Amino acid sequence: MNMKSKGFTLIELLVVVAIIGILATVVLASLSSARERARDAKRLADVKTIQNALEIYHLENGRYPSSALLASGIPNSDPHNATSSNDSWGKFETRMGITLPRDPVNDVVGDGDWLQNTGYAYFYRSLGGNCEGQEYELYYKLETDSSGGGSVGRCGRGPRVGSRGRFVVGFSPAG
């Protein structure tokens, strides 16, 4: 009696599973980079929103918001900083009078100086001294571009370069 076997051999099944695994890996890698690009696009839009809010504040008050009181009560915080991943951002929002966007990942922990950390957050710094209220720095970091950014400061300050992120510098025309 001659019986023909119907079905798949173990080797054929293993080959199919291996091919599916390879395809799944490629698809997941593509989705991951697409998510990073989408978060970066949101970051760039958020930075523009925050800049617009700062300019409106400047028009109404003749100065940018001082962040000297924003970080009070936060251990090891620089008194001129506001970081979107800790309580100082809420104080910044209160001072601005609006709700400001937060980074899509928003995972910085530590002392408030996110440039020394590896997480993602927005970081507002009101410059003190003669520049108080006339200049600010707004830092952000992209996932798909790790190059630093920089700009020449005002009020007699030299160039400021972010070692782990980009930043924009705003200043009043008279500043």
Please describe what each predicted stretch is.
Residues S33-E36, I56, S66:
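Active-site micro-motifs of SAM-dependent methyltransferase domains
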Residues L59-L142:
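Extracellular/periplasmic head regions of type IV pilus-like filament subunits
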Residues L44-G62:
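N-terminal alpha-helical signal peptides/signal-anchor transmembrane segments
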Residues N130-G175:
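Short, surface-exposed interaction loops/tails
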Residues S5, K42, C131-G133:
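A generic fold-level signal
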Residues N2-L31, R35, R39:
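N-terminal single-pass transmembrane signal-anchor helix
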